[in-house]
Amino acid sequence: MHALEQKILTEGIVLSDQVLKVDAFLNHQIDPVLMQQIGKEFAARFKDAGITKIITIEASGIAPAIMAGLELGVPVIFARKYQSLTLKDDLYRAKVFSFTKQTESTIAISNKHINSSDKALVIDDFLANGQAALGLIDLIHQANAEVVGVGIVIEKSFQPGRDLLLEKGYRVESLARVQSLADGTVTFVKE
């Protein structure tokens, strides 16, 4: 997605050869016009998948997931990372390891919002090692629902997440595929 790649080049900050900071438009401050374009792009790519639910993880996956849900006309469920007073019973749970934060957390969604008749699309902000996506897929499988694909805003193609998901048979659609962050420069996979 050209507009996203341009935004990464102009406003993204390479912190290391492994870490790209995009808090100017995605992870802290959110560019709503770009998010709307992202939602439309995900909707176009998955329009024939029969999606009934979009599943994401708090917090940075929520904005692109909401915009995709708006375009597709389907509800969005975000998995919580922390125990809540209002979300404590009848939960599907999975453990996920965050590459960026280097921590493991338990994510959860209520079993009242997803069931075996659902066709779910996973959407997340980044794909690195694939652990967040696999955790969300685990939650969907616990509900006996179908995973129709994984939509990623920014994929770090030099890390194993994409290959891991493809090997397990999942469709992966990434809007920006970063080939390298070497020498402080973002280069994209040529499609």
Curated annotation (Swiss-Prot):
Question: What reaction(s) does this enzyme catalyze?
Answer: XMP + diphosphate = xanthine + 5-phospho-alpha-D-ribose 1-diphosphate
Q: Which UniProt keywords apply?
A: Cytoplasm, Glycosyltransferase, Purine salvage, Transferase
Task: Tell me the Gene Ontology biological-process terms attached to this UniProt entry.
Answer: purine ribonucleoside salvage; xanthine metabolic process; XMP salvage
* Keyword presence, Cytoplasm: yes
Q: In which pathway does it act?
A: Purine metabolism; XMP biosynthesis via salvage pathway; XMP from xanthine: step 1/1
Under which EC number(s) is this enzyme classified? Answer: 2.4.2.22
Tell whether tRNA-binding is among the UniProt keywords.
no
Please name the top-level EC class of this enzyme.
Answer: transferase
Q: Where does xanthine bind?
A: L20, N27, K156
Cite a GO CC annotation: cytoplasm
- Entry's localization field: Cytoplasm
Binding positions for 5-phospho-alpha-D-ribose 1-diphosphate per the UniProt entry: A128, N129, G130, Q131, A132
Q: Which Gene3D superfamilies match?
A: 3.40.50.2020
Q: Provide the family line.
A: Belongs to the purine/pyrimidine phosphoribosyltransferase family. Xpt subfamily.
Q: How does it assemble?
A: Homodimer.
**How is this protein named in the record?**
Xanthine phosphoribosyltransferase
What lineage does UniProt assign to this protein's organism? Answer: Bacteria, Pseudomonadati, Pseudomonadota, Gammaproteobacteria, Moraxellales
